[in-house]
Amino acid sequence: FQDDPGEGMQAYIFKRFYWWEKECKETMEKTFGMKLIYSSWKEVNERAAQIDEKAALDEFCSWNLPCDPAVTDEQKTLIGQLYLAICEVIEKLGGVDGIGANCLNETMYCKTTPCTIWNALFEKYGIVWCCEGDTLTLLSTYILYHSLEAPVQMTNIYPFLVGQAAIYHERIDSFPKVDDPENYALGVHCGYAGFAPRKFCGEKWKVMPKVLAIVNEKATMVDCELPVGDMVLAKINPSFDKITVIPGKIEKFVQFPNTDSLNATLLHYKNGEKLMEDLPSHHQMIIVGKQKAKIAQIAKVFGWNYEVIE
């Protein structure tokens, strides 16, 4: 769902992403035999506003999601309305396997945020998701989740080597103190560790009030935590002929009160300088477990070049 990629609330940040380019869409469709369909984010939100409020609240409540006490019935209703409007589009199209929205930069069209909706669509229909309309991550999530069936999360990666740029962006005072900071990163997206479905996080999953100033005051986000332990970062490269894998660990979760990073994943890996050179995107997928060898086999099936940073 998008209308004007590159324009909107923070065009100076979002002006150009490769996944918005016509070349990206056409290459993706040709390479993988899939179809990428754009639908209006503005129109689906206008339709959401027309949906009966009681029906929308009942729909949300039927999901039995853990919610912070600060999340109001009005916020739940807005989520339910948008969910039902999106379901109308899905039913009309048919055969939808993945979904996303340009939700941050075009937040002016929306009174809520779609994070909780992605959870419902995944739980009910197995539809995978991406944040910010990142179709490269959507494709990566679809292929790798359905191949590995391991818990996966999309997030922003902030290597400590990025320095002040990351600290400023998340409004934190400093990175956590560690012995080898060149080999650490924070995983943060929209105020928390990033979105993952409830089934991947157990009890460490809750609907929370929004954090970022860019979104509507009635918006929400999910505070969730993947299991601590082995993980890989992985994503298909924009060339669509290569996949980059970074083995490491989810070491713990760290909190920064009164910032844009209330709960972040602390990621530890090897060869941080190489990661800075070759990481294909700041949007990364965290996949739980020791998945390096399995992804190598997936790469053979798809004919991808396979790069491991370790």
Write out the residue ranges for each language-model feature.
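Short, surface-exposed linear patches
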Residues: M28, D58-C61, A120-K124, F175-D179, ...
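Aromatic/acidic polysaccharide-binding cleft in carbohydrate-active enzymes
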Residues: Y109-T112, M154-E170, V178-D179
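The substrate-binding groove and active-site-proximal loops of carbohydrate-active enzymes
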Residues: E74, A196, C201
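Extended hydrophobic packing segments that form well-structured cores
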Residues: G202-E310
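Short, highly charged low-complexity linear segments
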Residues: P159-I167, K199-K210
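C-terminal functional extensions of proteins
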Residues: L84-C87, L138-G163, D278-F302, V308
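Conserved anion/nucleotide-ligand pocket segment
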Residues: F1-F17, A166-P197
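Conserved, well-structured core segments that form the ligand-binding/active-site neighborhood
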Residues: F1-A150, M154, Y158
